Amino acid sequence: MNLIKDTDQEHVCIFGGDYIYRMDISQMLRFHKKREADLTVAAIPVPVSEARHFGIIEVDENLCMTGFVGKPQISPRTMPGQPYMLLASMGNYIFNRHPLEDKLQQDSQDGQSVHDFGRDVIPKMYPGGKVYVYDFSQNHIPDAQPKEAGYWRDVGTIRSYWEANMDLVGIEPQFNLYNQQWPVLTYNPPFPPAKFVHFSYFRTGHATNFMISPGAIISGAMVKKSVVGCNTRVHSFSHVNESVVMNNVVIGRGCIKYNSSKGVETIHLSQICNRKSTNENIEHICIIGSVCVSCNQRIRVYLK
C-alpha cells in the first residue's frame, strides 16, 4: 500500500510476471480512460473448449464486466456476437488509484479473504463499480504479423515453458523476436558469439530451426528445433532435438537429447543418454540446466 500512497499518480498498473506476450500498454490505458473505468482487466478470446484452463470473464455488449468464473467445468456466458468464444483473464489490470486503495483496505480487514486479486479483490469491484474488459487481440503492434495478434502464453508450468520456447524456433515464429519496430529488450551477457566447429562427413557442427545464445559452441554435433543457452557446449556426435538447454550446460560426446511430447501425461523433464541405449518410444519434454553430462549417463527427472 505504501507504494501506492507514496505517489500522486492517478492510475496503477498491475501485470503478471510469468506470462509471455508483446503489448502496447498505452492502448489499454486509453481504453480505460475513455470508459472512465475504475478497473480494466485485459483478456484474450479463447475457444469454449479451452474454458477449463482459464479464469473466464463474462461481459455485456459494452465490454462491461458482469461475472467471473475460475476454470469452469461448464461453459459460462460467451462473448457478445461470438457464441463459440470466451474471454480469458490475462492477469493484467489497470486501476484507478482511489478505488483500488478502498478495496485493498476492505480486503485487509476481511478474515475470510486470502488476499488474491482474482479471487477476492476484483469480484468485490465489478458488481458496484465500473469494471471493463480490454480485448488484447485488438492491441496493435507495429510490424507484427496477423498470426501474432493476441499471442499470450502462461509459462507457470514446465510444459508451458517448453511450448513457449518451441514457439520461437519456427521459420515464421508465433512470437517473433526479430521485430525491429517493437524489440524485446533483455540483458546480453559479455560472451563471444556462438561458434560451430568441425567439418567432415560424420562430424559437422550443424543446426536448423534453432536459437543459440552467445558463448555456445556446437562441436561436431547436431541441434534441431531447440533453444540453447549461453556458454553451453555440445560435443561431437551428440543430437539435440526439440529441447531447451539452459545456460552453462556441457553435453558430452555421443549423447542424444530429444523430445516427442504427443499425448504425454507423465512428463520426463530431461533424459540424456547414449544412442545405443535409447528407448525410441519414450515420450517426454526435454529441459536441462546447469549440469555436465557424458556418454552412457542417463538422467530422468519426473514432474509429480
Sequence positions of predicted segments:
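Unchanged
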Residues: M1-E172, V264, N296
